[in-house]
Amino acid sequence: MPAYATRLLTGVFLSIFLFTFHADVRAQAPSESVRVLFIGAHPDDVDLKAGGTAALLAKEGHAVKFVSLTNGDAGHYNMGGGILAKRRRAEAKEAARRLKIDEYEVLHYHDGELMPTLEVRRDVIRLIREWDADVVVGHRPNDYHPDHRYAGRVVQDAAYMVQVPNVLPKAEPTEGNPVFLYFQDRFEKPYPFEHDIVVVIDDVIGRKVSALDAHESQFYEWLPWVSNALDEVPEDDSARQEWLRERWTSLMSDAERDGLEKWYNDRQVKEARYTESFQIAEYGRQPTDEEIQKLFPMLADQ
């Protein structure tokens, strides 16, 4: 075969290969990327409340960012201040790597001193705008910890303002309003949590536990100390993660199962073990069921 013909055939085969590879990559990518911003009060709050959902979103190629409004510099019994804050930033970075999310930002506000001030509200507005969030998830404003309560309050205060051009004019306002959701909590007053969106996280429960494991200062030191269980923490790494799973990832409640039935078929509901729930806030855009399935594509796949 002449050399020019060989080169021609090689070029044809290479073009076919590249086209096939490109088409395969496009098939694996989400048809429309969803941008989700999770805002907690402390490094580790979001991991505990929504680590599984975040892992599922990231696994499907969607954009996920965690934010901690405080630096966590008070959450320990024998260390604190800048040394603890530095340690907790490193733990958050490692947790983000294990969950395979895009970013984990820890702000500078002191642990235990968060207030719903104009300064914090502006930071939250900026974060939502810069991330161009479709969904923003945060604490309910009725929680046991003052930082949780005020983190929830400041997200509420920012919910409308993110779309007002004259507020922080250097940060481009959102086009319309994102959907705002609440993390699940156990508090009943002034009103109980509503399981509007329930996500099965069985496929990524190991990844969630691994992310919690990254926060050593909290799950193996501070929180066991608070509950007088420090002597129960295993020394062995694998035993630690199993202990962590048993202690911090409870099986779903009847209320969660009832919420699950809206989004999953009977077999899936019966087989599900671990879930995460979210309540739709009255602030922000009010999504239809179809919109929720677009924002949480794992629900549309059922």
Give the predicted meaning of each segment.
Residues 1-6:
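N-terminal secretory signal peptides that target proteins for export/translocation
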Residues 7-21:
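Bacterial N-terminal signal peptides
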Residues 26-131, 153, 161:
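Active-site rim/loop-helix segments in enzyme catalytic domains that contact anionic ligands
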Residues 32, 164, 168-169, 174-176, ...:
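C-terminal accessory domains and tails appended to enzymatic cores
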Residues 62, 175-179:
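A short helix->loop->beta-strand "cap" motif at the edges of active sites that frequently abuts
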Residues 76-79, 191-195:
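Short acidic, glycine/proline-rich loop/turn micro-motifs
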Residues 102, 134, 178:
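Conserved acidic residues
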Residues 127-171:
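Active-site adenylate/phosphate-handling loop in enzymes that bind or generate adenylated species
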